[in-house]
Design a protein with these regions (language model features):
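Short, surface-exposed beta-strand/loop micro-motifs that present aromatic residues
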Residues: 76-80
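Basic, Lys/Arg-enriched alpha-helical interface segments
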Residues: 1-73, 83-85, 93-118
Length: 118
């Protein structure tokens, strides 16, 4: 029985000013919530590609990791995959059944910024 290998490595999207929104967002969560999200991201790292209920495709090259936090809160981390890199673009606590347009647009803007930097 061999050691399971990562299929994708995680990287935080950084703006031109070096701001990593997802990393900063994670720091504000409780240790338990960070662990839940970390476990879910690790599952994606080792099992990519995955589908529901953990990962849902939102748009072309854009997916979300769906995590349950304490107090029945739900978080979403929007990401893209470039080669063997899973790039975490945007994160938020979900408050409605649909992904808010503003959060979706933020992730898409970060994704196009990555494309321009290539």
């Amino acid at each position: 029985m061999g050691t399971k290998r990562k299929i994708v490595d995680v990287q935080f999207y950084k703006s031109d000013t070096g701001n990593a929104q997802v990393k900063e967002w994670l720091k504000k969560l409780t240790p338990g919530d960070r662990k839940n999200i970390g476990d879910d991201i690790r599952t994606v790292e080792f099992g990519w590609p995955l589908g529901m209920p953990l990962v849902r495709k939102i748009d072309t090259d854009l997916w979300e990791v769906r995590s349950t936090l304490s107090n029945n809160r739900i978080s979403r981390i929007l990401f893209t995959v470039c080669g063997d890199m899973m790039i975490l673009l945007h994160a938020f606590i979900k408050k409605t059944s649909k992904t808010p347009k503003n959060d979706l647009n933020t992730a898409k803007r970060h994704m196009s910024h990555l494309e321009r930097k290539k």
